[in-house]
Amino acid sequence: MNIPERISALRALMEERGYDVYMVPTDDFHQSEYVGDHFKVREYITGFTGSAGTAVFTKDEAGLWTDGRYFLQADQQLAGTGVKLYKMGEPGVPTVEEFIASALPEGGTLGFDGRVVAIEEGAALEEAVASKDAKINYSEDLVGEVWTDRPALSEKPAFALGEEYTGESTESKLARVREAMKKAGADVHVIAALDDVCWITNLRGDDVDFFPLLLSYAVITMDEMKLYIDERKLNDDMKADLAKNNITIHPYNAIYEDIKNLDTASTVLVDPNRLNYALFNNIPGGTKVVQQVNPTIAMKAKKNDVEIRNIINAHKKDAVAMTKWMYWLKTNIGKIEITELSAAAKLETLRKEQEGYLWQSFEPICASGEHAAIVHYEPTPETDVPLTQNGLFLTDTGGGYLEGSTDISRTFAFGELTQQMKEDFTTVLQCNFNLAHAVFLEGTTGYNLDVLARMPAWRRGINFNHGTGHDVGYLMNIHEASCGFRCAIREKEQAPLMAGLVITDEPGIYIEGSHGVRTENELLVRKGPKNEYGQFLYFEPITYVPIDLDAIIPEMLTDQEREQLNEYHKKVYEIVAPH
């Protein structure tokens, strides 16, 4: 079936089951940003492959809501499907909830699979339908019924990380989580976020492409942890280690029934953005519930000394591979045919030469020419093109190593560039350095500093429609949720920057139909001086890959910026030259 046929089949089921509006989010059962093949339901029904977006269907309308990273991509992928693009945050564009409220008839029914909707979003939908005296049915996955050849859940095995990589035992992590539970007044903590479960157990898996995560849930009490997982993923040594910490193993889906049997005298801690609506609604009525951010988010964001040492080593390895790749690209462009996909394949070959390399840490972005204006463009056999011999090649890639994950963007210059390309490249470098050299007091948030990265672009009347940076997980999610750099305030994401945090600095400029530039380094937050004003913090760049000097206009740089660039390249040379 093509996309219009799939939508027609969905509408037939909506009519049969009595749904007036049906919503299809991106998430899996764990509110993951990136999902395994089994959970790519929104992609199946719309054809849009981006990592963020929500589809809504009525009897005669279909819409997809996504953010600024994906406007160009969605516009192209939705063409001919009958699905209308709604650009989130743009003037005059209704929110998903506003659209649903207007589309529902009085007394109508909104449907969705409650396992792929977070508690907080479910509450917002309850408010939306209340205005029409409508009801919600969250018990059916209608698209799953249409998708007859849907991939099965992953059955890939888990692997364990020793303390030489994690720097902390499961016993210690559980003790810290239980202490946080006490502070919250809770004696039960229900966790669905895959990276939180993996962090606590020091286990990793391969259930989501590029992300070493295990499909699992956890319920933690003061004396036990129940791990809900396909037991076949665990070997005997893992089971024995879990048992030492009184972690019992239960079938993956059994949590939905087990939650119904919680003691109503208990107090349950849940994260409204990281636990699904269906699971939440299975908590017995009358049970006290505390809704707050999972304590593990801050715990895993602050890297310990062992993790920091390992992460820096991973970046040194990655720098060797990236620098070899840069040399290969610059010396072979125009001599042999290099396409977006073949360039990405060459980089992975070079990364595989590094000890401890596992796999790419996310789908590589290798975008030549006008493709680079699509913020998260990922080449496919259908879109793959030869690299332009006169223009820019934007790359955003990463490697997953036993010592940690990397995330790096470099834009390479080939042949003759236009003046605007050079100006944009130089401006992005200024944006990157302006943020990277900030010194700030403890308690400062990413919101406070984001303007530093945007100011050089804003002075030219240019903006980039995405966040400037995100914190990075230790061989888990490449995007972690504790904080980030962005100018659009999100009420729930205002955690301060703290020593031990690893965060990206990735400004960009994107010119539709022409080119795109992004320069990204990872930054480690370090402690600086402490005095009567408080504890000062600063950033240490831990990405050690050359910036392409062929695209820079030196006259645009201040003396200080030139000195910063030279100092950065001196550090890069010291690390990479021996290899």
Report residues per predicted region:
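Active-site neighborhoods and metal-handling regions in enzymes and metal-associated proteins
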Residues: 1-579
